[in-house]
């Protein structure tokens, strides 16, 4: 998949504000601060397309980006961040859960997992949620360049054991660009 154009389309704080469109949606989900916005920026070649922050919980809305005028990339709020009010966590969970379970336009969910922490319970719960709702999903291991070779092997084994239905697993480094072409090739299969 070659990305020729990528533009911000809209942000939604509620499900009723989602775009009325038949364009396929490729959704990016993961724990807070896993690198969703950074990945979107490196995939599209636009440094400031999605706002990034070192502060977990920066993305608080469902953010839509139009890609090549033929599909959306959707950046969801991160899950698992404890330093926000309980009510805010509940609202994020309701928004994220409602979107994934109800949105017909979703063609693929890309689950980002921090390769340094591949066995987090919240990531396992997300995989179970995606499988329950029969959503096709792939896994992107972020921050992969920070692992030693021995750790890389352990991470891939761990993931294969609890994500049997994943369409793909891609190692990704925003710094080196490792995994970018592989991920774009995978995404091409879900563009409609």
From Swiss-Prot:
Pfam families assigned: MMR_HSR1
InterPro entries: G_ENGB_dom, GTP-bd, GTP-bd_ribosome_bio_YsxC, P-loop_NTPase, Small_GTP-bd
SUPFAM superfamilies: P-loop containing nucleoside triphosphate hydrolases
Keywords, sorted A to Z: Cell cycle, Cell division, GTP-binding, Magnesium, Metal-binding, Nucleotide-binding, Septation
Residues that bind Mg(2+): 37, 59
GO molecular function list: GTP binding; metal ion binding
Cofactor names: Mg(2+)
Keyword match Magnesium: yes
GO BP terms in the entry: division septum assembly
Superkingdom field: Bacteria
Domain spans labelled EngB-type G: 22-192
UniProt binding sites for GTP: 30-37, 57-61, 75-78, 142-145, 172-174
Gene3D superfamilies: P-loop containing nucleotide triphosphate hydrolases
A single cellular component GO annotation: cytosol
Record function comment: Necessary for normal cell division and for the maintenance of normal septation.
Protein family according to the UniProt entry: Belongs to the TRAFAC class TrmE-Era-EngA-EngB-Septin-like GTPase superfamily. EngB GTPase family.
Protein name in the entry: Probable GTP-binding protein EngB
């Amino acid at each position: 998949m070659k990305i020729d154009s990528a533009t911000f389309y809209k942000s939604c704080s509620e499900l009723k504000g989602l775009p009325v469109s038949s364009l396929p949606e490729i959704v990016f989900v993961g724990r807070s601060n896993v690198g969703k916005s950074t990945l979107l920026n490196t995939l599209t070649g636009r440094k400031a397309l999605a706002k990034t922050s070192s502060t977990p919980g920066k993305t608080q809305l469902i953010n839509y980006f139009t890609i090549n005028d033929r599909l959306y990339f959707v950046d969801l709020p991160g899950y698992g961040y404890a330093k926000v009010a309980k009510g805010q966590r509940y609202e994020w969970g309701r928004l994220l859960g409602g979107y994934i379970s109800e949105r017909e336009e979703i063609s693929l969910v890309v689950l980002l997992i921090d390769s340094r922490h591949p066995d987090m319970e919240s990531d396992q719960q997300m995989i179970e949620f995606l499988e329950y709702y029969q959503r096709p999903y792939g896994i992107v291991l972020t921050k992969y360049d920070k692992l030693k070779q021995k750790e890389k092997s352990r991470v891939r084994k761990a993931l294969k054991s609890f994500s049997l239905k994943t369409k793909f697993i891609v190692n990704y480094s925003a710094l080196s660009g490792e995994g970018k072409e592989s991920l774009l090739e995978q995404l091409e299969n879900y563009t409609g």
